[in-house]
A protein has these predicted regions:
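Amphipathic alpha-helical "stalk" segments
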Residues: 1-221
Length: 221
């Protein structure tokens, strides 16, 4: 069994777009950098998962080894010309290095202690999200999380319960995309442009916030 670990969105350097999530009623968590990968992020934590706004802070690192095979740099650089601005990570429902739900390879960035690795899906076009699996992943409200983060938000949301991803080619998705959709509450929809609809708590408040065009996100709570 699998769960959503987090959804990321490529944004401008410094992540000023995160301010729009704050204005929508989300409380920002601790930011992070990824040494050796050339990226940094601003994050928003919920009980079961988190949203991450990521940018490239060091193009040389992002294009060097061992990051180059991930394709992260061309995705960041091409986000305005057709590449998907999203990445989506799954994790096992219970902590532990269980098998991934899709074929892939083990990416071992410098910021992860051995033997931890990120399982990156193969056979995925740049028009689809960057699918990956964290066998070591945990819920943000798990006592074993490395650095505890607040999951309280003025908007009153608690958990991400569904993600709907729209984009070119998602009507005929890759094998990895189909595996992700089968593993958790991820819906894939064909569309001319990229967007993600994130539903919190089953949408019980009956409210929505469309953050486009600043962010390709629609929040339902």
């Amino acid at each position: 069994m699998f769960e959503l670990d987090h959804l990321f969105v490529w944004v401008s350097p410094g992540g000023p777009e995160a301010d729009h999530l704050v204005a929508a009623g989300l409380a920002e968590g601790e930011p992070n950098i990824h040494p050796g990968q050339g990226t940094a992020c601003r994050r928003f934590f919920f009980r079961n998962a988190f949203l991450e706004l990521v940018w490239v802070r060091d193009p040389a690192e992002a294009q060097g080894e061992p990051t180059r095979p991930t394709g992260l740099w061309p995705r960041f650089a091409g986000r305005a010309t057709g590449a998907s601005p999203f990445g989506l990570a799954l994790r096992p429902s219970h902590p532990g290095n269980g098998p991934a739900p899709f074929p892939g390879w083990e990416y071992r960035p410098a910021y992860l202690p051995a033997p931890l690795a990120i399982h990156v899906a193969t056979g995925v076009p740049a028009s689809e999200p960057w699918w990956f699996y964290l066998g070591f992943g945990r819920r943000p409200d798990d006592p074993g999380w490395p650095r505890p983060q607040s999951t309280d938000h003025p908007l009153g949301v608690q958990e991400i319960t569904r993600v709907r991803l729209a984009g070119p080619g998602l009507g005929q998705p890759s094998a990895a995309a189909r595996a992700v959709a089968a593993a958790w509450q991820v819906e894939l929809v064909e569309a001319s442009g990229h967007a993600a609809e994130v539903t919190f708590d089953g949408g019980r408040q009956g409210r929505a916030a469309d953050l486009r065009p600043v962010l390709p996100l629609i929040l339902h709570c």
